[in-house]
């Protein structure tokens, strides 16, 4: 699965990607992501209403009443998009994330898991989550240390409003393909160990623009690509 990382890009870029067939989008910052989710949801509603009005008018007569809100190839209907949160999670942003996103890739603390579970609204599907693992051992990088994912997975399994889907990693950048593959292979092995403990996992979120080939060779089910889709970031 291709996850289009839309951080820093405006809603218009997401519309264009949607028109080209993309449905899943990733955001790193809760506030920025929620603003886009809200804007695009309102736009989708406006276009659905306009589309319905146009269809009703066609039923009553042969006349077609043009409307700026009606969907077209250039103005897609914007059916529900799938939103993934992929950045570091601040405690004070857990409610925003739990209320607006369908996926979280960067869960690495029991406290955050509990807060997301508590904030997930009643009547909504469980929040899909991946545990982030620090496969490179970088001191400044988020993620649990390899071997600690099992404890967090057991905690998540007891939280009814979260659904553990798999593991995520953002390895330290390197051009050494052998090293890239070794780090991604480690994540796959950790996922297999969790499966042996009874966790039904189906997701390996790993690989970005510069290392996605190595990630795919090691079993990635979801790759995160931004600038290759949207162009260079300006901020």
What are these regions (language model features)?
Residues 1-48, 52-58, 64-65, 69, ...:
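Conserved alpha/beta-domain cores
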Residues 221-222:
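Divalent-metal-activated hydrolytic enzyme cores
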Residues 235:
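Active-site loop ensemble at the mouth of alpha/beta enzyme cores that anchors a bound cofactor
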């Amino acid at each position: 699965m291709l996850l289009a990382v839309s951080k820093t890009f405006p809603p218009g870029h997401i519309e264009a990607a949607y028109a080209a067939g993309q449905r899943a989008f990733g955001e790193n910052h809760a506030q920025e992501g929620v603003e886009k989710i809200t804007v695009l949801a309102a736009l989708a509603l406006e276009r659905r209403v306009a589309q319905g009005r146009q269809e009703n008018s066609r039923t009553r007569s042969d006349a077609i009443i043009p409307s700026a809100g009606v969907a077209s190839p250039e103005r897609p209907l914007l059916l529900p998009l799938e939103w993934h949160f992929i950045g570091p999670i601040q405690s004070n942003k857990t409610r925003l994330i739990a209320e607006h996103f369908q996926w979280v890739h960067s869960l690495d603390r029991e406290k955050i898991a509990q807060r997301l579970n508590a904030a997930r609204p009643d009547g909504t599907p469980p929040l899909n989550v991946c545990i982030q693992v620090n496969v490179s051992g970088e001191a400044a990088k988020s993620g649990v240390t390899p071997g600690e994912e099992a404890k967090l997975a057991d905690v998540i399994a007891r939280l009814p409003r979260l659904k553990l889907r798999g593991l995520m990693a953002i390895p330290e950048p390197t051009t050494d393909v052998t090293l890239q593959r070794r780090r991604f292979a480690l994540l796959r092995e950790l996922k297999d160990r969790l499966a042996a403990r009874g966790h039904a996992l189906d997701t390996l979120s790993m690989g970005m623009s510069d290392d996605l080939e190595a990630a795919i060779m090691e079993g990635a089910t979801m790759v995160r690509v931004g600038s290759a889709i949207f162009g260079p970031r300006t901020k």
